[in-house]
Amino acid sequence: MHYHRYVPFGLLKSEIEGADFFFAPNGRTDPEAELRASASAFGSDRPIGALHQNAQCAFPERFRFVKQALGLQYKEVPCPILDRFLAQFGSDPGAESVTLVFSGAQQDSPATMFGHTFFRINSRKKGQSELLDQGLSYAAIAPPDDGPLIFYWLGMTGGYHGHFSTMPYYLKVNEYTLAESRDLWEYKLSLTPEQTQTLLRHAWEIESNSWMSYYFFDGNCAYALLALLEVARPDWELTPFSLYVIPGEMVKRITRIPGAVTEVTYRPSLKKKLERKIKTLSSQERDDFYGVIRGERDPLSIDSSGVLDAAGIYFLFEKQKNDGKLPADLAYRMRLVLSRRSALGGASTVAPPAEPSAEALDSAPSTRPDLGHDEIQLG
Protein backbone atom coordinates (compact mmCIF):
# COMPACT_ATOMS: atom_id res chain seq x y z
CA MET A 1 0.00 0.00 0.00
CA HIS A 2 3.11 2.21 0.19
CA TYR A 3 2.22 4.06 3.40
CA HIS A 4 4.87 6.46 4.65
CA ARG A 5 4.99 8.80 7.60
CA TYR A 6 5.81 12.30 6.37
CA VAL A 7 7.82 14.74 8.47
CA PRO A 8 7.59 17.16 10.22
CA PHE A 9 3.94 16.49 11.16
CA GLY A 10 4.03 12.70 11.23
CA LEU A 11 1.20 12.33 8.72
CA LEU A 12 0.72 8.76 7.53
CA LYS A 13 -0.21 8.66 3.86
CA SER A 14 0.09 6.33 0.88
CA GLU A 15 2.19 7.44 -2.07
CA ILE A 16 -0.47 5.99 -4.39
CA GLU A 17 -2.79 8.83 -5.38
CA GLY A 18 -5.64 7.52 -7.53
CA ALA A 19 -8.90 7.10 -5.63
CA ASP A 20 -9.62 3.75 -7.32
CA PHE A 21 -6.70 2.22 -5.44
CA PHE A 22 -8.55 2.47 -2.12
CA PHE A 23 -11.78 0.86 -0.96
CA ALA A 24 -12.23 3.03 2.14
CA PRO A 25 -12.97 6.77 1.67
CA ASN A 26 -10.06 7.54 4.00
CA GLY A 27 -7.99 4.58 2.85
CA ARG A 28 -5.04 6.68 1.72
CA THR A 29 -4.37 7.84 5.28
CA ASP A 30 -5.91 5.05 7.41
CA PRO A 31 -4.41 1.57 6.84
CA GLU A 32 -6.78 -0.14 9.29
CA ALA A 33 -9.86 1.27 7.58
CA GLU A 34 -8.47 0.22 4.21
CA LEU A 35 -7.76 -3.32 5.45
CA ARG A 36 -11.35 -3.72 6.68
CA ALA A 37 -12.77 -2.28 3.47
CA SER A 38 -10.52 -4.51 1.35
CA ALA A 39 -11.61 -7.64 3.23
CA SER A 40 -15.22 -6.74 2.50
CA ALA A 41 -14.64 -5.80 -1.16
CA PHE A 42 -12.99 -9.13 -1.99
CA GLY A 43 -16.26 -10.89 -1.20
CA SER A 44 -18.29 -8.61 -3.48
CA ASP A 45 -19.23 -9.16 -7.12
CA ARG A 46 -19.25 -5.43 -7.90
CA PRO A 47 -16.83 -4.56 -10.75
CA ILE A 48 -14.37 -1.78 -9.96
CA GLY A 49 -11.83 0.45 -11.68
CA ALA A 50 -11.31 1.50 -15.28
CA LEU A 51 -11.21 -2.14 -16.45
CA HIS A 52 -14.40 -3.07 -14.54
CA GLN A 53 -12.77 -6.04 -12.84
CA ASN A 54 -13.74 -8.01 -9.80
CA ALA A 55 -11.78 -6.73 -6.78
CA GLN A 56 -9.87 -10.02 -6.58
CA CYS A 57 -8.62 -9.46 -10.15
CA ALA A 58 -7.90 -5.75 -9.75
CA PHE A 59 -5.81 -6.32 -6.61
CA PRO A 60 -4.43 -9.88 -6.77
CA GLU A 61 -1.49 -9.28 -4.46
CA ARG A 62 -3.59 -7.45 -1.87
CA PHE A 63 -6.13 -10.28 -2.11
CA ARG A 64 -3.40 -12.82 -1.36
CA PHE A 65 -2.17 -10.74 1.59
CA VAL A 66 -5.65 -10.28 3.10
CA LYS A 67 -6.39 -14.00 2.89
CA GLN A 68 -3.13 -14.90 4.59
CA ALA A 69 -3.10 -12.10 7.19
CA LEU A 70 -6.72 -12.46 8.28
CA GLY A 71 -7.24 -16.16 7.59
CA LEU A 72 -10.33 -15.47 5.48
CA GLN A 73 -11.89 -17.76 2.87
CA TYR A 74 -13.39 -16.48 -0.38
CA LYS A 75 -14.98 -17.93 -3.47
CA GLU A 76 -12.29 -17.10 -6.01
CA VAL A 77 -13.21 -15.83 -9.47
CA PRO A 78 -11.49 -16.12 -12.89
CA CYS A 79 -9.38 -13.14 -13.97
CA PRO A 80 -8.87 -13.28 -17.77
CA ILE A 81 -7.48 -9.73 -18.14
CA LEU A 82 -4.94 -10.28 -15.37
CA ASP A 83 -4.01 -13.65 -16.84
CA ARG A 84 -3.26 -12.03 -20.22
CA PHE A 85 -1.07 -9.43 -18.53
CA LEU A 86 0.96 -12.08 -16.70
CA ALA A 87 1.19 -14.33 -19.78
CA GLN A 88 3.25 -11.76 -21.69
CA PHE A 89 6.10 -12.38 -19.23
CA GLY A 90 6.17 -16.08 -20.02
CA SER A 91 3.77 -18.96 -19.58
CA ASP A 92 4.19 -22.63 -18.78
CA PRO A 93 5.83 -22.17 -16.35
CA GLY A 94 6.17 -18.36 -16.61
CA ALA A 95 8.41 -15.60 -15.28
CA GLU A 96 11.42 -16.89 -13.36
CA SER A 97 13.40 -13.91 -12.08
CA VAL A 98 14.10 -10.20 -12.47
CA THR A 99 17.09 -8.31 -13.85
CA LEU A 100 17.61 -4.65 -12.97
CA VAL A 101 18.85 -2.73 -16.02
CA PHE A 102 20.65 0.62 -15.82
CA SER A 103 21.20 2.79 -18.88
CA GLY A 104 23.81 5.52 -18.87
CA ALA A 105 23.17 9.12 -19.88
CA GLN A 106 22.58 10.11 -23.47
CA GLN A 107 25.09 12.61 -24.81
CA ASP A 108 23.71 16.16 -25.13
CA SER A 109 20.45 15.20 -23.39
CA PRO A 110 20.07 16.88 -19.97
CA ALA A 111 16.88 14.93 -19.31
CA THR A 112 18.93 11.70 -19.17
CA MET A 113 21.84 13.02 -17.10
CA PHE A 114 21.06 10.67 -14.17
CA GLY A 115 20.51 7.63 -16.39
CA HIS A 116 17.46 5.38 -16.28
CA THR A 117 16.52 2.08 -14.66
CA PHE A 118 13.98 -0.56 -15.60
CA PHE A 119 13.38 -4.28 -15.08
CA ARG A 120 13.79 -7.19 -17.45
CA ILE A 121 11.47 -10.03 -16.51
CA ASN A 122 13.32 -13.27 -17.21
CA SER A 123 11.12 -16.07 -18.54
CA ARG A 124 11.76 -19.79 -18.21
CA LYS A 125 11.31 -20.72 -21.86
CA LYS A 126 14.11 -23.11 -22.78
CA GLY A 127 16.34 -21.94 -25.59
CA GLN A 128 14.79 -18.48 -25.76
CA SER A 129 17.11 -15.49 -26.01
CA GLU A 130 16.84 -13.03 -23.14
CA LEU A 131 16.30 -10.38 -25.82
CA LEU A 132 12.80 -11.83 -26.25
CA ASP A 133 11.95 -11.30 -22.58
CA GLN A 134 9.78 -8.36 -21.54
CA GLY A 135 10.99 -5.09 -20.06
CA LEU A 136 8.99 -3.35 -17.33
CA SER A 137 9.51 0.42 -17.12
CA TYR A 138 8.19 3.32 -15.08
CA ALA A 139 8.15 6.79 -16.58
CA ALA A 140 6.31 10.10 -16.59
CA ILE A 141 3.52 10.51 -19.11
CA ALA A 142 4.22 13.94 -20.61
CA PRO A 143 2.25 15.50 -23.49
CA PRO A 144 4.48 15.70 -26.59
CA ASP A 145 3.86 19.44 -26.98
CA ASP A 146 5.21 20.34 -23.51
CA GLY A 147 8.28 22.52 -24.01
CA PRO A 148 11.53 22.12 -22.02
CA LEU A 149 10.60 24.70 -19.37
CA ILE A 150 7.19 23.15 -18.74
CA PHE A 151 8.71 19.66 -18.75
CA TYR A 152 11.33 20.51 -16.13
CA TRP A 153 8.92 22.49 -13.95
CA LEU A 154 6.27 19.79 -13.88
CA GLY A 155 8.94 17.12 -13.43
CA MET A 156 10.33 18.95 -10.40
CA THR A 157 6.91 19.57 -8.82
CA GLY A 158 5.18 16.25 -9.47
CA GLY A 159 2.97 17.59 -12.22
CA TYR A 160 3.10 14.38 -14.26
CA HIS A 161 1.58 10.99 -13.53
CA GLY A 162 4.02 8.09 -13.51
CA HIS A 163 2.94 4.83 -15.16
CA PHE A 164 4.34 1.36 -15.74
CA SER A 165 4.66 0.01 -19.27
CA THR A 166 5.97 -3.14 -20.93
CA MET A 167 8.03 -3.62 -24.07
CA PRO A 168 10.07 -6.50 -25.56
CA TYR A 169 13.60 -6.25 -24.24
CA TYR A 170 15.22 -6.28 -27.67
CA LEU A 171 13.40 -3.02 -28.45
CA LYS A 172 14.82 -1.47 -25.27
CA VAL A 173 18.31 -2.68 -26.23
CA ASN A 174 17.95 -1.20 -29.70
CA GLU A 175 16.59 2.06 -28.31
CA TYR A 176 19.39 2.58 -25.81
CA THR A 177 22.50 0.99 -27.32
CA LEU A 178 21.80 1.85 -30.97
CA ALA A 179 19.53 4.87 -31.32
CA GLU A 180 20.73 6.74 -28.21
CA SER A 181 24.28 5.34 -27.78
CA ARG A 182 23.70 4.53 -24.10
CA ASP A 183 25.45 1.68 -22.30
CA LEU A 184 23.35 -0.93 -20.50
CA TRP A 185 24.34 -2.60 -17.24
CA GLU A 186 22.31 -5.65 -16.21
CA TYR A 187 22.07 -6.87 -12.60
CA LYS A 188 20.31 -10.19 -12.17
CA LEU A 189 18.49 -10.18 -8.82
CA SER A 190 18.04 -13.13 -6.48
CA LEU A 191 14.24 -13.23 -6.70
CA THR A 192 12.44 -16.57 -6.73
CA PRO A 193 9.70 -17.27 -9.31
CA GLU A 194 7.03 -16.60 -6.66
CA GLN A 195 8.65 -13.31 -5.63
CA THR A 196 8.79 -12.37 -9.32
CA GLN A 197 5.06 -13.06 -9.63
CA THR A 198 4.45 -10.93 -6.53
CA LEU A 199 6.28 -8.03 -8.18
CA LEU A 200 4.27 -8.40 -11.39
CA ARG A 201 0.93 -8.70 -9.62
CA HIS A 202 1.63 -5.53 -7.68
CA ALA A 203 2.69 -3.66 -10.81
CA TRP A 204 -0.68 -4.69 -12.25
CA GLU A 205 -2.49 -3.35 -9.18
CA ILE A 206 -0.93 0.09 -9.53
CA GLU A 207 -1.04 0.41 -13.30
CA SER A 208 -4.61 -0.82 -13.83
CA ASN A 209 -6.12 1.15 -10.95
CA SER A 210 -4.06 4.21 -10.11
CA TRP A 211 -0.84 6.19 -10.45
CA MET A 212 1.91 7.94 -8.51
CA SER A 213 3.10 11.48 -9.10
CA TYR A 214 6.42 11.55 -10.93
CA TYR A 215 9.27 13.63 -9.50
CA PHE A 216 12.71 13.86 -11.09
CA PHE A 217 14.60 13.40 -7.82
CA ASP A 218 12.47 11.15 -5.62
CA GLY A 219 9.25 9.78 -7.15
CA ASN A 220 11.12 8.82 -10.33
CA CYS A 221 11.81 5.55 -12.17
CA ALA A 222 14.34 4.47 -9.55
CA TYR A 223 12.10 5.06 -6.55
CA ALA A 224 9.04 3.45 -8.17
CA LEU A 225 11.02 0.32 -9.02
CA LEU A 226 12.48 0.17 -5.51
CA ALA A 227 8.97 0.40 -4.06
CA LEU A 228 7.80 -2.36 -6.39
CA LEU A 229 10.78 -4.55 -5.55
CA GLU A 230 10.27 -4.01 -1.83
CA VAL A 231 6.83 -5.64 -2.05
CA ALA A 232 8.54 -8.81 -3.28
CA ARG A 233 11.50 -8.49 -0.87
CA PRO A 234 10.41 -6.46 2.19
CA ASP A 235 13.51 -7.66 4.05
CA TRP A 236 15.68 -5.57 1.71
CA GLU A 237 14.21 -2.29 3.10
CA LEU A 238 14.77 -0.37 -0.12
CA THR A 239 12.66 2.80 0.11
CA PRO A 240 13.76 4.75 3.24
CA PHE A 241 15.82 7.30 1.27
CA SER A 242 16.44 10.59 3.05
CA LEU A 243 15.29 13.01 0.36
CA TYR A 244 15.98 11.80 -3.14
CA VAL A 245 17.08 8.78 -5.12
CA ILE A 246 18.51 8.75 -8.62
CA PRO A 247 19.04 5.65 -10.79
CA GLY A 248 22.74 5.20 -10.03
CA GLU A 249 22.09 5.36 -6.27
CA MET A 250 19.33 2.78 -6.66
CA VAL A 251 21.79 0.36 -8.25
CA LYS A 252 24.35 0.91 -5.48
CA ARG A 253 21.73 0.42 -2.78
CA ILE A 254 20.70 -2.95 -4.20
CA THR A 255 24.22 -4.22 -4.93
CA ARG A 256 25.25 -3.53 -1.33
CA ILE A 257 22.64 -5.97 -0.02
CA PRO A 258 24.44 -9.30 0.51
CA GLY A 259 23.25 -11.84 -2.03
CA ALA A 260 20.83 -9.50 -3.81
CA VAL A 261 22.71 -9.58 -7.14
CA THR A 262 23.76 -12.90 -8.64
CA GLU A 263 25.24 -11.75 -11.96
CA VAL A 264 26.37 -8.52 -13.67
CA THR A 265 26.62 -8.11 -17.45
CA TYR A 266 27.32 -5.17 -19.73
CA ARG A 267 25.97 -4.27 -23.17
CA PRO A 268 28.06 -1.51 -24.74
CA SER A 269 26.45 1.17 -26.83
CA LEU A 270 27.16 1.18 -30.54
CA LYS A 271 29.54 4.10 -29.98
CA LYS A 272 31.50 2.22 -27.31
CA LYS A 273 31.52 -0.85 -29.51
CA LEU A 274 33.05 1.19 -32.34
CA GLU A 275 35.66 2.78 -30.08
CA ARG A 276 36.69 -0.61 -28.69
CA LYS A 277 36.89 -2.13 -32.17
CA ILE A 278 39.12 0.67 -33.48
CA LYS A 279 41.52 0.14 -30.55
CA THR A 280 42.08 -3.46 -31.64
CA LEU A 281 43.28 -2.43 -35.13
CA SER A 282 46.93 -2.14 -36.08
CA SER A 283 48.30 1.16 -37.38
CA GLN A 284 47.91 0.01 -41.01
CA GLU A 285 44.40 -1.30 -40.34
CA ARG A 286 43.38 2.04 -38.85
CA ASP A 287 44.62 3.80 -41.98
CA ASP A 288 42.56 1.38 -44.07
CA PHE A 289 39.52 1.92 -41.83
CA TYR A 290 39.63 5.71 -42.16
CA GLY A 291 40.23 5.35 -45.87
CA VAL A 292 37.10 3.23 -46.25
CA ILE A 293 34.78 5.50 -44.27
CA ARG A 294 36.10 8.61 -46.06
CA GLY A 295 35.65 7.03 -49.47
CA GLU A 296 39.39 6.95 -50.17
CA ARG A 297 39.68 3.14 -50.20
CA ASP A 298 37.58 0.60 -52.08
CA PRO A 299 36.03 -1.75 -49.47
CA LEU A 300 36.30 -4.61 -51.97
CA SER A 301 40.11 -4.33 -51.78
CA ILE A 302 40.22 -4.82 -48.00
CA ASP A 303 41.28 -8.25 -46.70
CA SER A 304 41.04 -7.49 -42.96
CA SER A 305 37.80 -8.60 -41.31
CA GLY A 306 38.59 -6.27 -38.39
CA VAL A 307 38.71 -3.23 -40.68
CA LEU A 308 35.45 -4.20 -42.35
CA ASP A 309 33.74 -4.89 -39.01
CA ALA A 310 34.82 -1.48 -37.71
CA ALA A 311 33.64 0.21 -40.91
CA GLY A 312 30.31 -1.62 -40.73
CA ILE A 313 29.79 -0.49 -37.14
CA TYR A 314 30.71 3.08 -38.12
CA PHE A 315 28.15 3.21 -40.93
CA LEU A 316 25.52 1.67 -38.67
CA PHE A 317 26.31 4.30 -36.03
CA GLU A 318 25.94 7.09 -38.59
CA LYS A 319 22.67 5.57 -39.75
CA GLN A 320 21.26 5.53 -36.22
CA LYS A 321 22.34 9.14 -35.65
CA ASN A 322 20.35 10.15 -38.73
CA ASP A 323 17.04 8.50 -37.84
CA GLY A 324 17.82 5.29 -39.67
CA LYS A 325 18.89 6.91 -42.93
CA LEU A 326 22.23 7.36 -44.70
CA PRO A 327 23.16 9.66 -47.59
CA ALA A 328 23.30 7.74 -50.86
CA ASP A 329 27.11 7.67 -51.01
CA LEU A 330 27.47 6.33 -47.45
CA ALA A 331 24.69 3.79 -48.00
CA TYR A 332 26.52 2.54 -51.10
CA ARG A 333 29.82 2.24 -49.20
CA MET A 334 28.08 0.38 -46.39
CA ARG A 335 26.67 -2.16 -48.84
CA LEU A 336 30.15 -2.72 -50.28
CA VAL A 337 31.59 -3.17 -46.76
CA LEU A 338 28.95 -5.73 -45.79
CA SER A 339 29.32 -7.56 -49.10
CA ARG A 340 33.10 -7.81 -48.74
CA ARG A 341 32.80 -8.83 -45.08
CA SER A 342 30.38 -11.61 -46.00
CA ALA A 343 32.77 -12.86 -48.68
CA LEU A 344 35.60 -13.16 -46.14
CA GLY A 345 33.47 -15.37 -43.89
CA GLY A 346 33.86 -15.90 -40.16
CA ALA A 347 31.92 -14.36 -37.30
CA SER A 348 31.13 -10.67 -37.71
CA THR A 349 30.72 -8.17 -34.87
CA VAL A 350 28.62 -5.74 -36.91
CA ALA A 351 25.12 -7.12 -36.47
CA PRO A 352 23.29 -5.63 -33.44
CA PRO A 353 22.21 -6.05 -30.75
CA ALA A 354 25.43 -7.29 -29.22
CA GLU A 355 25.30 -9.99 -26.59
CA PRO A 356 26.98 -9.17 -23.27
CA SER A 357 30.40 -10.69 -22.69
CA ALA A 358 33.12 -10.90 -20.07
CA GLU A 359 35.39 -8.88 -22.35
CA ALA A 360 32.82 -6.10 -22.51
CA LEU A 361 32.38 -6.19 -18.73
CA ASP A 362 36.09 -5.64 -18.17
CA SER A 363 36.38 -2.89 -20.77
CA ALA A 364 34.14 -0.22 -19.26
CA PRO A 365 34.47 -0.02 -15.46
CA SER A 366 34.17 3.78 -15.51
CA THR A 367 30.50 3.61 -16.55
CA ARG A 368 29.45 0.97 -14.04
CA PRO A 369 27.05 2.69 -11.60
CA ASP A 370 27.61 0.48 -8.56
CA LEU A 371 31.34 1.28 -8.66
CA GLY A 372 30.87 5.05 -8.84
CA HIS A 373 31.28 7.59 -6.04
CA ASP A 374 28.45 8.01 -3.55
CA GLU A 375 26.16 10.98 -3.99
CA ILE A 376 25.80 13.53 -1.21
CA GLN A 377 22.82 12.52 0.93
CA LEU A 378 20.48 15.35 1.82
CA GLY A 379 17.94 15.50 4.58
Task: Label each residue range with its predicted role.
Residues L86-F89, G104-D108, S363-T367:
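Generic recognition of flexible, low-complexity loop/linker segments
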Residues F151-A222, A232:
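N-terminal accessory/precursor segments of enzymes
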Residues C79-D83, P93-S103, A358-L361:
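Short linear interaction motifs
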Residues G94-S181:
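Glycine-rich catalytic cores of cysteine/serine-nucleophile enzymes that process amide/ester linkages
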Residues M1-P78, Y187, H202-L378:
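Activation targets extended, charge/polar-rich intrinsically disordered C-terminal tails
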Residues T117-R120, G135-A139, K188, A222-E230:
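Active-site scaffold segments
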Residues Q88-S97, P110-T112, H116, T192-A203:
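Active-site-adjacent bridging/hinge elements
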